[in-house]
Amino acid sequence: LPGVTGAGGLQALIKGGLPVAGERIVVAGSGPLLLASAATAQDNGAQVLNIAEQAHWSAVAGFAAQLPRWPGKLLQACTLFHPGYRANSHVVEALGDGRLQAVRLSIGGRIRKVACDRLACGFGLIANLQLGQALGCRIELNALAVDDWQATSLADHYAAGESTG
């Protein structure tokens, strides 16, 4: 259904010039990418109505409790807070005739219909660091540490993409 994208996809489209000013957006799924995608949309003039986090509050609290180990990420998380953030929530249905017009959200077990122009979904995007770790690359802030040229801590070993944060 046009108007429905991945959360990372919407973020990339916006950074590539997609105009979203004035659009009503719902972001749904799991993980910190939801907050980053919502912030990108909002910074570009979109009205982010809800961030529907699939994880329960206990899981979100467990994740948040780990953030003080990485002060930079803790500060970033604080700047990404959104009043429409709801844990224990998920999309039940995307509604529209030829284009997205609304979504049905389950928020804490209660169904709510939200009129919107875009839905961005992302579920459990976690960078895979296994190869870099196995090779002995230095890890910083849950990512492979790289310099400005994408070189890792190992000579002649480079990394790019999500694994580098």
Say what each PLM segment does.
Residues L1, G9, E53-H56, H90, ...:
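Short, ordered loop/turn segments at secondary-structure junctions
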Residues P2, Q11-S58:
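Rossmann-like NAD(P)H-binding beta-loop-alpha module
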Residues Q42-Q130, A134-E140:
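A Rossmann-like FAD-binding core segment of flavoenzymes
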Residues T5-I14, R99, R118-G165:
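FAD-site-proximal beta/loop scaffold in flavoenzymes
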Residues E23-A28, P32, A61-F63, C116-L119, ...:
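Flexible, glycine/proline-enriched loop segments at strand-loop-helix junctions
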Residues P2, V26-L33, P83, L95, ...:
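Catalytic cores of large soluble enzymes that bind and process phosphate-bearing ligands
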Residues A21-R24, N88, D97, L154:
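Phosphate-coordination loops involved in phosphoryl transfer and adenosine-cofactor binding
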Residues K15-G17, S37-A41, V92, G109-R110, ...:
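A generic local secondary-structure boundary/capping motif
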